[in-house]
Structure formats: C-alpha cells, structure tokens
C-alpha cells in the first residue's frame, strides 16, 4: 500500500512545471474554416421530424447525458445523409455533403486527411476520390483496415507523392500516428476531434495546417463544432440550457 501520496505530490510540484505544446514547439499556425452545406428537401423533412421526436423524448422524462447525446447524434446523422430507423435498419437520404467534400478537395493543394465516423461514409468518400483522382491517390486507416496494412498506408501517404489523401476514423487514427505531409485536415462529420487535429500538427510539420469542418446550415452541426472547438462538454452544456437552442 502506498503512503504519503499527498506529500509526495506536493514535493514533486515544487520541481515541475506544466508546459503546453505551443509553448515549447516551434510549429506553424493552425487555420480553421467552415464549409456550409444546404440540406436537401428530403433531409430537411427527416431532420424536422427527428427534431420534433427528440423534443418529445426529452420533454417526457428526466434528461440524462446519454439521452441528450443520443438525440444529438441522431440529428447529426441525418445531416450526414443517413439515420438508423427504429427497426435497426440504416436509411440513406440524398445529401450534398459528399459533393461539398469533393469541391474542397478540388481546391486543396498538397495532401489532405479526411476524418469520418461512419463506415458507409468512408466507403463513399474513397469511391468518389478514386473515381476522380485514381486508385493510387488514397489510402484508408480505420477499424476495417487490416493491421498489417496500417503502417504501410501511413508510409505511402507520407512518402508517395501520388498518394494525396488518407481517409480514416478518429477512433482509429486520432491517436499515436504521424501524418505531417498533410497541410489540410477535413472533418466530414463532427465526432471526437481534438486529438486528431494533432496528427498533422506536430514535430516535422513545416507548413501551416488548415482544418475544414463541413457544416449543414440551420442544424445542430454549428453548435457541435463550436463546443468541440471551445472544449465544452456537450452533454452538460445542453442540460444547462434550452435544447431548442441547440437543435
């Protein structure tokens, strides 16, 4: 059993100092931008129906963190072009998000990381990139990427001039990998992201890095991005104010 831990902690504090990354590393700046997407009529109808259902759920019982996050993610899924029905099936909705992503890529010079959360989106993104830029232009890094291919894909992205894009999930690629050849990071949707920003912004990066959020207008997307950027706990924030201000 360890003893006197409080005393040890106080002693260590007198000889230690907390230093932030930006204070000790000479890294180029981060730039942030948003690309706005207009919901299709089908999306807007589905979003409004889900919004009404979410309000009914949250007004009808004690609000919990899990309840809030579930409703927010259901709304966000619709802005991404799909949602999970009550029977568990995934329903696809016509949407403009992939079109806007391809517009961003067309305007992007150099290499780009594209983070997405849903497997169907990753597949769709890769198919669209291959169609425009060719099969050697993109690699993946997510849960279904075989372990033996993951490091090879990183090396290809870092060293092969023809490989301009890497598509992955922040759950798999947001920690512990280096992707400093990228000077653009695009968030296709709005899941956990703060650690994933630094896959491109770390030692070895010599260019400024631009972070692009794809945001559906007049939806929960805008609030989610602001909360993530400000490092706000989304569930506690929503519990502390009117939900209608978020959705």
Annotated model-derived regions:
Residues 30-32, 134-137, 180-184, 205-212:
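Short glycine-/polar-rich loops that comprise or flank the Walker A/P-loop
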């Amino acid at each position: 059993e360890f003893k006197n831990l409080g005393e040890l902690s106080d002693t260590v504090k007198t000889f230690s100092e907390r230093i932030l990354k930006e204070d000790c590393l000479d890294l180029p700046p981060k730039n942030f931008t948003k690309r706005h997407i207009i919901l299709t009529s089908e999306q807007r109808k589905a979003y409004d129906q889900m919004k009404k259902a979410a309000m009914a759920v949250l007004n009808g019982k004690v609000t919990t963190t899990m309840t809030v996050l579930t409703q927010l993610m259901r709304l966000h899924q619709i802005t991404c072009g799909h949602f999970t029905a009550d029977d568990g099936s995934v329903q696809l909705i016509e949407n403009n998000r992939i079109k806007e992503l391809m517009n961003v890529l067309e305007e992007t010079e150099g290499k780009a990381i594209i983070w997405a959360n849903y497997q169907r989106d990753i597949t769709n993104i890769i198919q669209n990139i291959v169609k425009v830029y060719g099969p050697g232009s993109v690699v993946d890094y997510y849960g279904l990427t075989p372990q033996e291919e993951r490091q090879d894909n990183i090396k290809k992205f870092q060293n092969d001039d023809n490989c301009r894009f890497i598509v992955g999930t922040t759950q798999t690629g947001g920690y512990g990998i280096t992707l400093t050849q990228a000077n653009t990071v695009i968030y296709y949707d709005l899941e956990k992201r703060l650690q994933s920003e630094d896959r491109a912004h770390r030692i070895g990066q010599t260019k400024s890095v631009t972070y692009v959020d794809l945001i559906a207008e007049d939806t929960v997307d805008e609030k989610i991005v602001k909360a993530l950027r400000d490092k706000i706990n989304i569930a506690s924030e929503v519990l502390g104010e009117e939900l209608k201000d978020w959705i």
